[in-house]
A protein has these predicted regions:
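Conserved PLP-enzyme active-site core in the AAT-like
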Residues: 1-111, 115, 121-124, 128-132, ...
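Conserved C-terminal alpha-helix-loop-beta "cap" of PLP-dependent enzymes
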Residues: 125-136, 140-235
């Protein structure tokens, strides 16, 4: 379960009280625009995230961001480009308009994702599965975890969601090794942007307790259709 901003504030305040020079760096992926403030307003010195997640509004094809203390942001830019150049130069591959439009759309798409996550939680709980967060509970990101307890069900759910995708719905999901994971991973990702998790998608490591992580969704109607189809297949 992710930390909410109140918890981040308590952690950062404690760290800074012990060492004011310590830098608190927060991975903000999946958490942008979910709460009414961001970690940099709650004691974090710098945050970073991906633009194929919340802030990209489902239309930005690649990229990421850093925000926070100007000195730290400039250091990150120097690491990205070169020392002495920093943020003064760089490329955006012509995606400037898409990035700005994605940021404009992001509050609405995050809202749809949150509604969808709550619906996913409610449906799976009704089917008898453990879910985290619980339906209608406070959320600090757009991810919904479901404990399926079965590799068969992992495959069944991922394949069903893939079949309900707007693109690549004809593909079969197969377990694959993914960098950063100890076990093979199953993914449902029929998305317009490759790898996008702000669009409706799911992934699940093939190991006990066989949890599946569902996230994203630009339209609540799509999530409803995917869940209806899944219920028919499970029952």
């Amino acid at each position: 379960k992710s930390l909410n901003n109140n918890q981040i504030k308590q952690i950062c305040n404690t760290i800074h009280s012990l060492n004011p020079n310590c830098v608190c760096f927060v991975d903000n992926c999946y958490g942008e625009l979910v709460e009414d403030s961001e970690p940099i307003s709650n004691g974090a010195n710098i945050i970073a995230g991906s633009l194929i997640k919340n802030l990209g509004g489902t239309i930005v094809p690649t990229g990421g961001y850093v925000a926070g203390d100007s000195e730290l942001v400039e250091k990150a830019c120097c690491r990205l480009t070169s020392p002495g150049i920093g943020s003064e130069a760089g490329v955006n591959f012509g995606y400037g308009r898409l990035i700005l439009q994605g940021l404009f759309l992001a509050p609405q798409t995050v809202h749809e994702s949150l509604k969808g996550a709550d619906m996913v939680a409610a449906v799976f709980k009704k089917l008898g599965f453990m879910v985290l967060p619980e339906p209608k509970s406070y959320r600090s990101d757009i991810i919904q975890a479901v404990k399926l307890n079965s590799p068969y069900l992992i495959k069944k759910v991922c394949q069903s969601f893939q079949n309900s995708s707007p693109v690549d719905s004809f593909l079969n999901v197969i377990p694959s090794p993914i960098s950063g994971y100890e076990s093979k991973l199953l993914m449902s990702g029929g998305t317009f942007i490759e790898g996008s998790t702000s669009e409706f998608s799911a992934d699940a490591p093939l190991r006990h307790p066989y949890n599946i992580f569902v996230q994203g969704g630009s339209h609540i109607a799509h999530i409803k259709i995917a869940l209806i189809q899944l219920v028919f297949e499970l029952l």
